[in-house]
Swiss-Prot record:
It comes from Salmonella typhimurium (strain LT2 / SGSC1412 / ATCC 700720). Belongs to the class-I aminoacyl-tRNA synthetase family. CDD domains: GlnRS_core. Residues 317-324 are annotated as: Interaction with tRNA. It catalyses: tRNA(Gln) + L-glutamine + ATP = L-glutaminyl-tRNA(Gln) + AMP + diphosphate. GO terms for molecular function: ATP binding; glutamine-tRNA ligase activity. This is Glutamine--tRNA ligase. InterPro entries: aa-tRNA-synth_I_CS, Gln-tRNA-synth, Gln/Glu-tRNA_Ligase, Gln_tRNA_ligase_bac, Glu/Gln-tRNA-synth, Glu/Gln-tRNA-synth_Ib_cat-dom, Glu/Gln-tRNA-synth_Ib_codon-bd, Glu_tRNA_lig_a-bdl.
Amino acid sequence: MSEAEARPTNFIRQIIDEDLASGKHTTVHTRFPPEPNGYLHIGHAKSICLNFGIAQDYQGQCNLRFDDTNPVKEDIEYVDSIKNDVEWLGFHWSGDIRYSSDYFDQLHAYAVELINKGLAYVDELTPEQIREYRGTLTAPGKNSPFRDRSVEENLALFEKMRTGGFEEGKACLRAKIDMASPFIVMRDPVLYRIKFAEHHQTGNKWCIYPMYDFTHCISDALEGITHSLCTLEFQDNRRLYDWVLDNITIPVHPRQYEFSRLNLEYTVMSKRKLNLLVTDKHVEGWDDPRMPTISGLRRRGYTAASIREFCKRIGVTKQDNTIEMASLESCIREDLNENAPRAMAVIDPVKLVIENYPQGESEMVTMPNHPNKPEMGSREVPFSGEIWIDRADFREEANKQYKRLVMGKEVRLRNAYVIKAERVEKDAEGNITTIFCTYDADTLSKDPADGRKVKGVIHWVSAAHALPIEIRLYDRLFSVPNPGAAEDFLSVINPESLVIKQGYGEPSLKAAVAGKAFQFEREGYFCLDSRYATADKLVFNRTVGLRDTWAKAGE
C-alpha cells in the first residue's frame, strides 16, 4: 500500500489512542476471524481493512484466525480462498495462521471448569424445546428441567457427550446464567453441541464442538488480542463474551467493540442468499463478476487499491447505513482512469471502407498508452482502408448534438485521419452492413489544412489486423437498490446484468493478462477474464463504464 493512502481516524482508533496513552495497553493486537464456510465479500473487506490496517498503523499485530467450529458447513476450499483474498488485498497476518480448532483441548477444559463451578449443565431438551423454553423479547424464558443437575452428574454426562454416547440433538452443554434476562443471548446459551462430522483440521478426534460465543472470546484471550472488533449484530453478544471470560481462569480479558456492517446497494450480502444465487445457477459461481465477493470483484477487474480506498471513504461508525453502488464504482473508475493503459476495441462492429485509401496497403499509427502519462509510453497501431467502427457511431441522419459520423459529414478517427461518409450498403432487413467513406490524406493526427473544423472523434480497429474478442458487459446484479427487502429477491435480478458481445480489438490486446485493466477508449474499463480467456479466445469483462449510467437513468 502506498503512503498516499492516508491514515484514517474513527471512534475505534480514538479508543486505541486513549488505551495506549493511559498505559492500558502497550501494543495493539487485532484479529480477523472468518468462518471458512463461504467466500469473502466486500463487507468482509471492510473488516479486513480495519483490523489489518489498525495493526499496520500502530506497528502492532493482526492474526488471521479461522473460526472453524462447525465441520458440517466448512471446507478447506474456503480456507484457501480466504487466505488468498487477504493477501490480494495487500495484507499479511502475524505469525502462523490460527484456527479455533487449535484450542479445542483448552476450550473443553474451560467448559469443564464452568461445570465444576456450577455454571454449566448438560441439557437433554430437544433443539425445538430449547427454543420454546427460551421465551421472547417480551416474555421471559423458563428453566429446563435438567438445569439443576449436580456437578458430578453434569461432568459424567459431558464426558458421555465427548465420547459419542449421545446422538446428535439429544444433548448439549448450556451456560447457567439467567432465563429471565432481558437479553435473550444470556438465557442459558448453548456452549457445546454434538456433531458427528469429520473436521478439516482435527479429523474425527471430536464429536462435540463449541459454539461461536464460547469459542470466540476464549480464542481472543489465548491469543492476547487487545481490541476485538465485531459488527453491530454482535453487540448483545458482548455480554456473553464478558461473562465467559469473567467466569474462567484466564489472565487476559480482551474488550469487544462493535462497528456498523457494510450494506451496499444493488446487491445482497447474506451468505444464504449468495449461496442460493450460486446453487440455483443465477450466477456462474462465487467468483462471478456480478457477485459482491472479493473473488468476483477481482475477476471483474477491481483492484485491491480501489477496494481499500472504498473502505477508507465509507469509514467506521456505529450507525448502520447503506452505501451507494456508485461510491464503489467511483473508486475503481478513479484508479483505472489514472493507471490503466488505453486501447481500442469495437463492441458492436460495422464495416467501414475508405474508398480512396490505397488498396491493400496499411500503415502504423503512433498512439499514447495514456493521454496524461507520457512515461507510460506509446504503441504502434495498424491502420488500413477497411476498419471496424461501432454501430452507434454512425447515423444516416442526426441533429447537431450528435458529434459522430453522419452521412455527408466528417469525423476524425482517433489518432488517424479525417473521413467523410459517402454512402452505405444494407441487407434485406434494412440493416447497414458497410459504410463507404473517403479520407483526407493530409490529416494524419492534424487538422485539415484549409482550416475547416471537425469536432467529432470516434475509435476504430483495422479490419485486416483486428483480434476477434468476446466482450462481457457486466452490470449490477439487481434492478432495485435494496433487493434484500423484496418479497422474492430472485425476482428482481437484473436481466441485463450480463450481455455478451462479439467484437474486435487492436492487436496489442494479444498481450493482455488477467487482472490487468485497459481503458477501451470511449467505452469503459475492461480486463481479460481469468476463467474463459485462452490463447485462442480473448474474453474481456467490463469492470465499469466511463461514467455512472445508473445515475443518469434515475434523473
